[in-house]
Structure formats: C-alpha cells, structure tokens
Amino acid sequence: TVQGFDISSYQPSVNFAGAYSAGARFVIIKATEGTSYTNPSFSSQYNGATTATGNYFIRGGYHFAHPGETTGAAQADYFIAHGGGWSGDGITLPGMLDLESEGSNPACWGLSAASMVAWIKAFSDRYHAVTGRYPMLYTNPSWWSSCTGNSNAFVNTNPLVLANRYASAPGTIPGGWPYQTIWQNSDAYAYGGSNNFINGSIDNLKKLATG
C-alpha cells in the first residue's frame, strides 16, 4: 500500500515536506461543495502539494456533493471550473465525488435511491465528457446502501474510495465493486486531514493518475 491523505479548508497550512518524508505520496484536496462554495485554501494547498521541497505529490481535487440542491451536471461543471479537473500530466488524480450525509440535511439529501443513482450518473457523465476520466466515488457502505440501494451501476467506470475509519481492514465493499481503489481509514492523519491508503503499489497510484 501507499500512504496518502485528504485535506480541506480546515487544514489551511500543511507541512507537505514533512508528509512526503513520512512516506505520503498522494493528496486529495477539497475544491468545492454544491454550486456555491469553494475552498479558499485550495490553490495554495494544490501548489504546495506540487512543489513540496522539490518532491511532488500526485494530487487531485474533491467535490462535496449536495445532491438535493442542484443537478449533478451543474455540480460537475462547478467542480471542474474551480480546480477539480484532470490532466494527463501524470501527477493529477481524477476528481473525487464525496457522497455522504451532512449535518441537518436529510441523510440522502431528500432523494430516492433511483434519483440518487441518476444524480451521481449525471455528475459522473458530465465529468467524463469534459475531462475524459470518470470521477472517483467516495462513500461508506451504510450511506451507499441506504441512499443508492447498494447500486452496482458504477463498478465498471468509477474507482471506489472507501471510508471505513479506525478499522484494521477495509471491511465491507459496497455496490458490487470487487475492491476499493483507496481506503480512508482514519480522520486523524499526523500532517492534517484524513489518512488514506492506495490499494496496491506506487505503480497502481501512477496508473490511477494517468488513466
């Protein structure tokens, strides 16, 4: 496995050099949420990950989905316009769509399972049409089961980023995916944000970046 981490505006200043020295090789940075929020620290975080003391991270952005508010296509466009796109430079991950509950919002954002699957597909298809890559999907088994009916509609297109924190193993893989591409196993990474592991070697990480 290869160490990585994900960060947001809650970690405005990150010791990327320290994280690299400790073995981290990739970072996923929050870019947007819904169609009205952008991470004010995104540019500095993204640039910091790219130029960390001469060592670079393979890096990408993520979008926190608000499925009940605007269309999947609109949120994909917003994400791409604010740093979430992809390029074939070998160090850019496909964008990640963060699918989970939030605060006082309904657990499934007020959508039926069928409507949620359609929303995710609309986001995914628009992202693919613009960038040439399908986004990674971040979720946990409970949310995916409750909110998509444990849909297997994305198995052949979208890499799975599995959230299963404070566990000794990835555990249940939802949605028919045979394995997780990335496992988020804690929200307390030493250099900020959440702890992640790529499923495989550095070559697997590079392949994820290059497509």
UniProtKB/Swiss-Prot annotation:
Disulfide bonds join C108-C147. It catalyses: Hydrolysis of (1->4)-beta-linkages between N-acetylmuramic acid and N-acetyl-D-glucosamine residues in a peptidoglycan and between N-acetyl-D-glucosamine residues in chitodextrins. SUPFAM superfamilies: (Trans)glycosidases. Gene3D superfamilies: Glycosidases. Its main location: secreted. InterPro entries: Glyco_hydro_25, Glyco_hydro_25_AS, Glyco_hydro_fam25_subgr, Glycoside_hydrolase_SF. The keyword Hydrolase applies. PANTHER family: LYSOZYME (PTHR34135:SF2). It is an enzyme of class 3 (hydrolase). It comes from the Eukaryota. Its EC number is 3.2.1.17. One of its GO terms (biological process) is peptidoglycan catabolic process. Belongs to the glycosyl hydrolase 25 family. This is N,O-diacetylmuramidase. It holds the Pfam family Glyco_hydro_25. Keywords: Antimicrobial, Bacteriolytic enzyme, Disulfide bond, Glycosidase, Hydrolase, Secreted. The active site is at D6, E100. One of its GO terms (molecular function) is lysozyme activity. GO terms for cellular component: extracellular region.
